[in-house]
Structure formats: C-alpha cells, structure tokens
Amino acid sequence: MERSNRKTRIGRVVSNKMDKTIVVAVETKVRHPLYGKIMNRTTKFKAHDENNTANINDKVLIMETRPLSKQKRWRLVEVVEKAK
C-alpha cells in the first residue's frame, strides 16, 4: 500500500498526559492578507503514540491516518529530536 500521498507535519509535543496519545503543536508562518506582516500560527493535533515514546518538548514527525477516535486523525512516525 502506497503511503507517500499522506500529509506529514513536524511539531513539538505539548502534552503526553493521555495514554497512547500526544498533543503536537505545529507552527506555520502566514502572511497577513492586508498588512503583509508574517505571523506564527499554531495548530494542535492529537496524535496516536502506540508505545508512549514521546515526551514534552520533543520534536516529532506525525502522519495523517484513518480516524482513530473522535479527535485523533494523526499518528506518530518518529521522534526527530529529544528534548534537552
């Protein structure tokens, strides 16, 4: 099964208090439509972490997947960088 067409995002883990679930904050830069200022937009995604490997402030790669619950549509692919 080809998975290259699924969306991926890189973000920081902001919560890991739930069992097998992490909250990942993904920051994107967006230009204001009228004034042109570049702003940071933050979107939070709930992602499935099967082995509870990610900790707070880890940089992680998540991938879109089938709906796993009411709010979870992403899963953890790898921990890119551990928190210091």
Curated annotation (Swiss-Prot):
Q: Does the keyword Thylakoid apply?
A: no
Give GO BP annotations, semicolon-separated. Answer: translation
- Which is one Pfam family of this protein? Ribosomal_S17
Indicate the segments annotated as coiled coil, or none if absent.
none
Sorted alphabetically, the Gene Ontology cellular component annotations on this record are: cytosolic small ribosomal subunit
Q: Which UniProt keywords apply?
A: Ribonucleoprotein, Ribosomal protein, RNA-binding, rRNA-binding
Q: InterPro entries from the entry?
A: NA-bd_OB-fold, Ribosomal_uS17, Ribosomal_uS17_bact/chlr
Q: Name one GO molecular function term.
A: rRNA binding
Q: What is the stated purpose of this protein?
A: One of the primary rRNA binding proteins, it binds specifically to the 5'-end of 16S ribosomal RNA.
Q: Give the UniProt family note.
A: Belongs to the universal ribosomal protein uS17 family.
Instruction: Name the PANTHER family on file.
Output: 40S RIBOSOMAL PROTEIN S11 FAMILY MEMBER, SMALL RIBOSOMAL SUBUNIT PROTEIN US17M
- Assembly and binders: Part of the 30S ribosomal subunit.
Name-wise, this protein is Small ribosomal subunit protein uS17
* Biological source species: Clostridium botulinum (strain 657 / Type Ba4)
